[in-house]
């Protein structure tokens, strides 16, 4: 008998957590403001941190005294309410989970933030599909990252329009932000042009770039891999960037749209 998609996901991904970055929140449709953890008579508003089919880690704003108070509920039963709103669907999906609080403690370096670790007593099929679909798609992005690495796209007006780029990017060096022009991009690198040299700009230095597209606004982190003087006071910066799922989607979509355009032109020329 053929396995169902749910059975396949449970076998492959039951212990694999996803971390709720802005990208994961958008793709899964989890409504961040509608995550609640109930312990006995206490209902806590949580920020999701990690979730698998067996375990969830949630962040709660609590004082030191409140954290000490709630630690008495370790190994006690709890319930979790999650709400998902997928793109294109009008009705939200509300899920109710039961579990056990395994650990409660302060988050190091974060004042008044508590981490609550809960083991789940079961995972609804809807949640299995949401997590499984996301993990499967994310693994596909990792494969595309390898395929597209080094394939730089010169960002002229036509390319910017095709990739739906809003022509706005900021280079971030520590606390310094500098407006830049994006001249080329790949899944593993960005080429930027700046007017002037902002403080801290040097080869090998960690940096990030915030990019604005119609589909996503996101930050790509990495290091300055090369610097070159341009005309006047202009500086040309090459960034080696880390795996950034939003950018991989944009590059993949660009090459797809480009191929469609090419086929349309070929057909028109016949």
Q: Where is each model-derived feature located?
A:
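Structured alpha-helical
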Residues: 1-270
């Amino acid at each position: 008998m053929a396995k169902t998609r749910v059975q396949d996901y449970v076998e492959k991904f039951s212990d694999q957590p996803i971390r709720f970055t802005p990208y994961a929140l958008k793709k899964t449709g989890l409504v961040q403001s509608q995550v609640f953890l109930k312990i006995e008579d206490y209902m806590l508003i949580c920020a999701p941190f990690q979730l698998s089919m067996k375990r969830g880690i949630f962040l709660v704003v609590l004082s030191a005294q409140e954290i000490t108070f709630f630690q008495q509920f370790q190994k006690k039963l709890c319930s979790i309410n999650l709400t998902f709103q997928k793109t294109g669907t009008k009705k939200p999906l509300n899920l109710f989970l039961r579990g056990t609080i395994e650990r409660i403690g302060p988050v190091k370096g974060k004042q008044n933030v508590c981490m609550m670790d809960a083991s789940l007593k079961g995972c609804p099929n809807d949640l299995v599909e949401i997590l499984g679909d996301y993990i499967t798609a994310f693994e596909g992005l990792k494969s595309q990252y390898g395929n597209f690495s080094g394939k730089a796209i010169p960002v002229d007006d036509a390319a910017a329009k095709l990739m739906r780029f809003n022509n706005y990017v900021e280079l971030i060096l520590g606390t310094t932000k500098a407006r830049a022009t994006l001249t080329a991009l790949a899944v593993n690198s960005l080429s930027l042009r700046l007017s002037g040299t902002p403080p801290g700009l040097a080869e090998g230095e960690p940096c990030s770039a915030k990019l604005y597209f119609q589909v996503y606004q996101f930050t790509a982190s990495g290091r300055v891999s090369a610097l070159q003087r341009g005309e006047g006071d202009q500086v040309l910066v090459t960034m080696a960037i880390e795996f950034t799922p939003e950018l991989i989607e944009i590059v993949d979509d660009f090459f797809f749209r480009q191929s469609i355009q090419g086929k349309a032109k070929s057909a028109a020329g016949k």
